[in-house]
Amino acid sequence: MFNMALVFFLIAVLAGILGFAGIAGTLAWAAKVLFFAGLILTVVFYLLGKRTPPV
């Protein structure tokens, strides 16, 4: 439990540093692009997996 608290604390400190440095906006844009790319790939692979395999 203490390990998880330490990990979340370090993530919060890193987020604070990035936020005050002005890098957070660029990283948020990159995260949004990666999220939508992953979402599109998930849908594509789901639809491709629904086909019956060739005999």
UniProtKB/Swiss-Prot annotation:
Q: One Pfam family, short name please?
A: DUF1328
Q: How does it sit in the membrane?
A: Multi-pass membrane protein
Gene Ontology CC entries for this record: plasma membrane
Places the protein is found: Cell membrane
Spans traversing the lipid bilayer: 4-24, 27-47
Q: Enumerate the UniProt keywords alphabetically.
A: Cell membrane, Membrane, Transmembrane, Transmembrane helix
Say which family it is in: Belongs to the UPF0391 family.
The molecule here is called UPF0391 membrane protein NE1120
Organism field: Nitrosomonas europaea (strain ATCC 19718 / CIP 103999 / KCTC 2705 / NBRC 14298)
